[in-house]
Amino acid sequence: IDANWGHSTNVVYQFCRQSPHSAILLPSHGRFVGASTIPFSEYKRRPGDRVGLNWRVPSIRGKRAIRHVIYDTNWWKSFTHARLGVAMGDRGCLSIFGDRPDAHRMFAEQVTAEYFIRTEGRGRTVDEWKARPEQPDNHWLDCLVGCAVGASMQGALLFGTDIPSARQSPRLSFNELQKQKRRDQ
């Protein structure tokens, strides 16, 4: 649940804590990650953090002491808009149901309420998203992006967007560890 709107942040946190569905609800915070700021891939991972494709659930500590997700809004808005640009039926397409455009007019207006400016800094290029002054409502865009982040958190991914996992050494039994220790002495 979007917890970035200042007036409702505490309400969202309280709802996520007190809901009968608290085990599966997370407040979310989109963060502007521009070309000159540190990308999510370079954040230092702390014990207890859950990290995914341009999102992370930090270990809980501090004032609100509740699990929450933080994600790179620029990356996820670009990802979501790219899905809308894929031809119907092709892999990676995001399609809207029905065949009556008038039924989706408000959704379309809000999903296009922002535009990006491609910027460069620190050796990387990033689409930085800005609000259109004539279209102040972007609630459906925020919801759509939040759904994409949520899907990623649940394991959904497109070919080529998966993060290479850290190579894990095979698990050893206690007996094997003892044998290995004796060999090394």
Give, region by region, the residue ranges found by the protein language model.
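Mg2+-dependent endonuclease catalytic cores in nucleic-acid-processing enzymes, primarily RNase H-like
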Residues: 1-123, 157, 167-185
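Extracellular low-complexity, Gly/Ser/Thr-rich intrinsically disordered linkers
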Residues: 106-159
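Short, Lys/Arg-enriched, Gly/Pro-containing loop segments at transmembrane-helix junctions
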Residues: 161-165
